[in-house]
Amino acid sequence: MTRSQLAGNWKTIFLALCFLILQGLSVAAAAPRTILFLGDSITAGYGLDMEQAFPALIQKKIAAKSWNFRVVNAGQSGDTSAGGLNRLEWLLKNRVDILVLELGGNDGLRGLPPETTRKNLQAIIDRVKAKYPEVKVLVAGMKVPPNMGGDYGRKFEAIFADLAKKNKAALIPFVLEGVGGSRELNLADGIHPTAKGHEIIATNVWKVLEPILRSLAGTQAIGGNGSRSLNAPAVRAA
């Protein structure tokens, strides 16, 4: 083999390696960021099809913006803050870029000590941040019925604003704003929102979530236009 042939072979190998590296970077860049909705029956969309639950409606809003984010619905009916903490390890096996934490409502309905709920929710945030330090956190505020007592209600409602402040997280003041207590917007049980109710919840969440997604979408250099549409529907965590 002549010197010129050897040089030509090395040039070919070099170009091939460059192509593979660039292809790998392109695939990595195209991977959507994940929004984990960790919640109870409100997040799960109790009594409705999954596509009617507010996380799926958020995915549609994202697709309309052509932003590259994937919604994972980890809502579980009847779940408490302790239950969410117990199943968190499995959920963190997949990367989490944004956490929407909607837990605590069932704690309040059961009259559990607010301090216990606070500790559990803080532990969830701590574990997610320990695994994914760059995660963005949104805390969804919740209220309890008046029959739980005024003192209990004040202590319970303070949990969410306090957690958001302590963790420099975004706060959805009351995720059921405009829905809670409405006969027309809840199922016969008076607790779980109808499809129309979930549309309002999605609007409540979107007001807080959209600015965060917008800021992150600007860093997604995909296909040269900064973002890529994700047409896949929201997925349910098993």
Where on the chain are the PLM-derived regions?
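Low-complexity, intrinsically disordered segments with a bias for serine/threonine
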Residues: 8, 30, 231-233
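Serine-esterase "nucleophile elbow" of acetyl-processing enzymes
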Residues: 28-77, 85-96
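N-terminal secretory signal peptides that target proteins for export/translocation
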Residues: 1-10
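Residue-level signal for threonine
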Residues: 53, 80, 194
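Bacterial N-terminal signal peptides
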Residues: 13-24
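Alpha-helical cap/lid subdomain in secreted, periplasmic
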Residues: 67, 85-225, 230-231, 236-238
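Short histidine/acidic/glycine/proline-rich micro-motifs that form metal-
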Residues: 42-45, 49, 75-79, 106-108, ...
